[in-house]
Every structure is written in C-alpha cells, then in structure tokens.
Design a protein with these regions (language model features):
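Hydrophobic regular secondary-structure detector
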Residues: 139-224
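Helix/segment boundary signal
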Residues: 1-8, 48-136, 168
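Solvent-exposed, acidic/flexible segments
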Residues: 13, 17, 21-25, 63, ...
C-alpha cells in the first residue's frame, strides 16, 4: 500500500485517495514495471482522476451542436501536432504544437464549432471539472480505504528474484515520491508499505523441499 509517513516512519494522514492513486498510477507503477521479470503492476483502490464535462442540453440545442461534435473537439484538443521544420539563418528547427491538456481551462477553451465567425467553446455549452472515475472495487486495510498495487511476476520467471528486484526498486524510487507539509507543520511523504510479501512463504517452501529431499536420500542410502 501507499501511505503518508513522517521522517520517522509514523503514519501522518493528510493525503486524499485521489492524490495517492495518482502517484501510484503515474510514478510507482511505471517504476516497478521496469523490474526484470515483472509482468504487470495492477493498481487497486483510491480514485482515478479524470476530466468530467457536464453538457447543457439546452445549450447544445440552441447552438445546433451534437454530442459527437463535443467529443470530437475534446479529443482533438488533447494531442501534440508536428509541423515539420522551418529554416532560419541556415539553421533548421523542428516545429511542434504542444496541445496536451494540463488543466480544466484547456478543455474549457476547446473550440467545438464556429457560428457566424464566433467560436463556440466547451465552456459555452457545459461545465468542466475534475472528478473521480467510476469505481468497481476498493482496497481495505484495517477497516479503512487504502491505495496499493499488486505486482505480478512474468510466467516462467524466478519469483524470489522478482521480489528482490521489486524491493530494490522500491528503495530506489522511495526518495522521489511526493511529499508535502501538513497543517500541523509535519512533512509527510508517500511511502510504499509492504502489504503481502511471498518471500517468507517461498523460503519455507524451499526449506521444506530441502528437508524432504535430504530425508529421501538418507532413506535410499539406508535401504541400499
């Protein structure tokens, strides 16, 4: 799980589920996916942040705009565009239009249609806001909602090596996780806390196999 902790490792709180899930999806997940032998890192719990557009049907009717036009306008407003090159003073420069959405205002200003040379923007026909995506499940830890991830090893890989690699990567990315100063002055940083670790189970299984094999070898020697 991912939790807010102080410098001594004590729980601090102060983080909402959406903030933690964002860090899990865009930082921790990609870091752990890079570990050799990892097939997938599945995020669980929290709220996935998304841009939500509440369209006004009366405004659509007044401007004679369809819902499909709104969807197309929003999709086209969220991408980078290449514009080849331009030569200045015998030097060639690459031209690129940066158009990825970074805030609510970027969507609000997207042009849906033009009526009588006047642009009709998304904000003219609806309300744009940040909100949580519809959830299909939660992660419960001690009776409280939490955010975490499940690391799935690739088929055929050595589970113990994958686990050790994940632990090493967690130590590597720990210092770069988001932090903030809470209202009481405590500095809280998101910290990865192991929820379920198969290391002990694997070690016990290996120990059981070694014991069973050694007993079988001794019995075979005695019988012979």
């Amino acid at each position: 799980t991912v939790e807010g902790r102080d410098k001594d490792g004590n729980p601090t709180g102060g983080w909402d589920l959406q903030e933690i899930r964002t860090a899990q999806d865009f930082y921790i997940k990609y870091g752990l996916n890079a570990v050799k032998g990892v097939s997938e890192v599945a995020s669980i719990g929290g709220f996935v942040k998304e841009y939500q557009i509440d369209v006004n049907p009366d405004a659509l009717k007044a401007y004679n705009i369809s819902l499909m036009q709104v969807m197309t306008a929003v999709q086209k407003s969220n991408k980078d565009v290449g514009a080849k090159t331009i030569e200045i003073n015998q030097a060639e420069y690459l031209v690129r239009g940066l158009g990825y959405v970074k805030k609510v205002e970027d969507i609000e200003l997207a042009v849906v249609a033009v009526k009588d040379n006047v642009p009709i923007r998304v904000k003219d026909i609806g309300v744009v806001a940040l909100g949580p995506e519809t959830r299909r499940g939660i992660l419960d830890k001690g009776g409280a909602e939490a955010v975490g991830g499940v690391v799935i090893a690739r088929y055929g890989s050595n589970p113990l090596e994958v686990i050790n690699g994940v632990k090493s990567k967690i130590s590597e990315i720990a210092s770069g996780l988001p932090k903030k100063t809470l209202a009481n002055g405590v500095v809280s940083q998101l910290t990865i806390i192991p929820f379920y670790d198969r290391t002990e189970l694997i070690q016990e299984t290996i120990g059981t196999l070694e014991t069973a094999l050694s007993h079988e070898v001794l019995i075979s020697i005695i019988v012979v």
